[in-house]
């Protein structure tokens, strides 16, 4: 049996298809984060981008997400050094830190159901930015991601 590509290649060596398949579809990167201007510490909130579907954990307009006017960031191989803001469970961050994929990752299990069952997605756990007045009230204390 051959070694999976994520174990045999660096992030920079991956094809576009391999790179895209690393995304588990959890939706955590689509949650708004706050950053302390003095310490650069990142605080996660449960406030979702208005384009995020909280049931499917995917963008409502995925093909146009970078031109929609939202603050959607494209994760690219030339930005690996900036991945510290991503959730600790994120495959891009984990591989950039030489950590293995989590056991529930779809590349390991073959589907997203294990991720949802492990509580590692944002499915039905968010509020939308349009409904929030003070984002600081929505900071997640000790997020499990």
Curated annotation (Swiss-Prot):
It holds the Pfam family CxxCxxCC. Belongs to the UPF0260 family. This is UPF0260 protein VV2402. It comes from Vibrio vulnificus (strain YJ016). The lineage of its organism: Bacteria, Pseudomonadati, Pseudomonadota, Gammaproteobacteria, Vibrionales.
